[in-house]
Swiss-Prot record:
Protein family membership: Belongs to the AspA/AstE family. Succinylglutamate desuccinylase subfamily.
Keywords: Arginine metabolism, Hydrolase, Metal-binding, Zinc
Protein name: Succinylglutamate desuccinylase
Pathway: Amino-acid degradation; L-arginine degradation via AST pathway; L-glutamate and succinate from L-arginine: step 5/5
Function noted in UniProt: Transforms N(2)-succinylglutamate into succinate and glutamate.
Reaction(s) the record says it catalyses: N-succinyl-L-glutamate + H2O = L-glutamate + succinate
Molecular functions per Gene Ontology: hydrolase activity, acting on ester bonds; succinylglutamate desuccinylase activity; zinc ion binding
Names of required cofactors: Zn(2+)
Gene: astE
UniProt feature coiled coil, ranges: none
Co-factor remark: Binds 1 zinc ion per subunit.
Organism: Salmonella agona (strain SL483)
Positions of Zn(2+) binding: H53, E56, H147
Positions of transmembrane segments: none
Amino acid sequence: MDNFLALTLSGTTPRVTQGKGAGFRWRWLGHGLLELTPDAPVDRALILSAGIHGNETAPVEMLDKLLSALYSGSLTLTWRMLVVLGNPQALAAGIRYCHSDMNRMFGGRWQSFAESDETRRARELELSLETFFSSGQARVRWHLDLHTAIRGSHHLRFGVLPQRDRPWETDFLAWLGAAGLEALVFHQAPGGTFTHFSSEHFGALSCTLELGKALPFGQNDLTQFNVTSQALSALLSGVETSTSSSPPLRYRVVSQITRHSDKFALYMDAQTLNFTAFAKGTLLAEEGDKRVTVTHDVEYVLFPNPSVACGLRAGLMLERLP
C-alpha cells in the first residue's frame, strides 16, 4: 500500500485491501483510512490525521512521505496506527471543504448541519475512531491532527489543544515542543474539532498542529517542516526526541468572537497575523448594538475570519500564560 494518497485522491478502491509491510500489517479501511499494526505486540495507539480541510496539503504530503518510509523499511513502526485523510473529496478538488467545515462537526454536532458529504464523513470518522480504539488495549493513546493555517502567523508552527479535565502529560507537551511548535494554545471549553472528539470520547492526548500556511499540492516547501517531520519519524519508531531548547509559549483561550448575522463586522484586515496583540479596550468587532472589546491588558487573536457562516466562530482571543 505505497499509493495510499493517490488512491484516496482518485476515489479508487485498491484490488488488494490488506497485506504485509516491513514489520507490520496494513488494512485499507476505506478512502482515506489506513490501519497499520506492528507484528510485535505494542501498548500504544496513534491517530495520525491530515486533510480535514482539503486546501491544507503540506501535512498530507508529510504523511505520504512517512508512509513511504514505513513501507520501504527505512522507518520502524512501534505504534498501532490509524492514518486518516479527513476530507478526500475536498482534497481532490483543492478546496477547504465542499459544503461545510467538518472540523466543527465532531462529537455528534454533524447532526445540526444540513446533510452533506462532510456530515457523512464526520460520522464515518467518529465510527472509525471508535472501532480503532475499542479493538485494542492501548495504555497510551495519542491523536495528532495536522493542519495549516489560512493566515500567516507570528508563530510559524503552533498547537491547539482541546479542553481537558485532567492535567496534560508532560511527555506529550515535551514532544510537541520537540516537534518544533513555537506556541501551544489551550482551549477552556468543549468544541466540535476532531481532536476534542478523540480526547473527550477516548481519553486520547490530542493536539491540532498548525504547520505554516495553506498551499496547493506541489507548492509546499516541506523543508520548513523538517523538525516536525523528524519528530514524527522518531515518534513512530520509538526513538526519544531531544527536549526543545526553547519550550513553546503557552496561551489560553479567554473568549470567542462569533458571527450571528450579516451585520457582523470584524475590525481586522486580511493582513492581520495569528497571535497579533491588541491592548485593553480595543474594539475588535461589532454586530448591531453589540460591541466586542479586549478586556484583559493584552489579548492575542487566533483564526480571525470575518466571512464565516452565521453562527460560527470568527476568531479566538487568547491570554498569554506565565
